[in-house]
């Protein structure tokens, strides 16, 4: 959309929008790409799946946007939406954990950092868990772990494949050992899913780090990733200081992991649904109408 077209569209409102520095920041009508500094009209960016049309940078998107990209229209049925975290340790740093929970819930409209449910992709069933980085950095606490475990168990019971969209800074430190045990719990549920020869795919988005990477994010039959996603366990600076070596510029990117065999395929956001449908079909997943006959 050109400037002339934009002003024509906005003339009745007589409003000049500010430029946001990030696609998920504020409500400015214009957004500056954090990679190439190209300024884009926010509506155009949204219509392009929040991907910069100039350099292809994939901006963060929330769980609702992700579900709309993956699932057939009106097919997503959410489960366990009322599960909400508590503060079992009475944890407090500069602020209490309880206050941080309330703030994140108010800011995102979510109870915790993952949305789970069943949907269809081109009429084929798929169990889906989508982590949302807006909620305390997508950190994995007891509720996140419980919801992911429950959707895996449901997928195992109903013989459905599962996709987990990973976007996380790792285990939630405010819950201590309770958060760390989610790594084993989810991994155990995935083992039972695998024993039934069912398909599990993690989609690694920016960022996927810490305990999430060290557990279910790397246990897939087919590991997908978005372009240039940050994927790793410890931070780059920590590794460099420990090894006393300079790491490659593209270290811990999706492309680096693909080159070294830790990721199977990098999928652009616009191609995600088509790619998932092909994978499901290749693995013999039947359409819901066919499966019920």
UniProtKB/Swiss-Prot annotation:
One of its GO terms (molecular function) is carboxyl- or carbamoyltransferase activity. Binds 1 zinc ion per subunit. Keywords: ATP-binding, Cytoplasm, Fatty acid biosynthesis, Fatty acid metabolism, Lipid biosynthesis, Lipid metabolism, Metal-binding, Nucleotide-binding, Transferase, Zinc, Zinc-finger. Coiled coil: none annotated. GO terms for biological process: fatty acid biosynthetic process; malonyl-CoA biosynthetic process. Gene3D superfamilies: 2-enoyl-CoA Hydratase, Chain A, domain 1. It is found in: Cytoplasm. A zinc finger (C4-type) spans 33-55. Zn(2+) binds at residues 33, 36, 52, 55. Residues 29-293 form the CoA carboxyltransferase N-terminal domain. It is an enzyme of class 2 (transferase). Its EC number is 2.1.3.15. Its cofactor is Zn(2+). Its main location: cytoplasm. InterPro entries: AcCoA_carboxyl_beta (IPR034733), Acetyl_CoA_COase_Trfase_b_su (IPR000438), ClpP/crotonase-like_dom_sf (IPR029045), COA_CT_N (IPR011762), Znf-ACC (IPR041010). It comes from the Bacteria. It catalyses: N(6)-carboxybiotinyl-L-lysyl-[protein] + acetyl-CoA = N(6)-biotinyl-L-lysyl-[protein] + malonyl-CoA. GO terms for cellular component: acetyl-CoA carboxylase complex. Pathway: Lipid metabolism; malonyl-CoA biosynthesis; malonyl-CoA from acetyl-CoA: step 1/1. SUPFAM superfamilies: ClpP/crotonase. HAMAP family: AcetylCoA_CT_beta. Component of the acetyl coenzyme A carboxylase (ACC) complex. Biotin carboxylase (BC) catalyzes the carboxylation of biotin on its carrier protein (BCCP) and then the CO(2) group is transferred by the transcarboxylase to acetyl-CoA to form malonyl-CoA. Belongs to the AccD/PCCB family. Acetyl-CoA carboxylase is a heterohexamer composed of biotin carboxyl carrier protein (AccB), biotin carboxylase (AccC) and two subunits each of ACCase subunit alpha (AccA) and ACCase subunit beta (AccD). This is Acetyl-coenzyme A carboxylase carboxyl transferase subunit beta. The gene is accD.
């Amino acid at each position: 959309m050109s400037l002339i077209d934009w002003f024509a569209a906005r003339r009745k409102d007589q409003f000049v929008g500010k430029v946001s520095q990030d696609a998920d920041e504020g409500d400015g009508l214009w957004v500056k790409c954090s990679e190439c500094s190209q300024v884009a009209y926010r509506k155009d960016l949204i219509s392009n799946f929040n991907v910069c049309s100039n350099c292809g940078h994939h901006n963060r998107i929330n769980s609702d946007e992700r579900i709309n990209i993956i699932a057939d229209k009106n097919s997503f049925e959410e489960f366990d939406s009322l599960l909400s975290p508590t503060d079992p340790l009475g944890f407090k740093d500069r602020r209490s954990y309880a206050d941080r929970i309330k703030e994140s819930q108010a800011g995102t409209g979510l109870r915790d950092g993952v949305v789970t449910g069943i949907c269809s992709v081109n009429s084929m069933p798929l169990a889906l868990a989508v982590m949302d980085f807006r909620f305390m950095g997508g950190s994995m606490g007891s509720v996140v772990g419980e919801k992911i475990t429950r959707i895996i168990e449901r997928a195992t019971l109903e013989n459905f494949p599962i996709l987990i969209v990973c976007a996380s800074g790792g285990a939630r430190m405010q819950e201590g050992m309770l958060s760390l045990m989610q790594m084993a719990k989810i991994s155990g549920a995935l083992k039972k899913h695998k024993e039934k020869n069912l398909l599990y795919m993690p989609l690694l988005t920016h960022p996927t780090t810490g305990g999430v990477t060290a557990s279910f994010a790397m246990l897939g039959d087919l590991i997908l990733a978005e372009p240039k996603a940050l994927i790793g366990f410890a931070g780059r600076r920590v590794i460099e200081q420990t090894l006393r070596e300079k790491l490659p510029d593209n270290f811990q990117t999706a492309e680096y992991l693909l080159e070294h065999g830790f990721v199977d395929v990098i999928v652009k956001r616009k191609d995600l649904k088509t790619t998932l449908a092909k994978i499901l079909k290749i693995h013999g997943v039947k359409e819901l109408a066919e499966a019920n006959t």
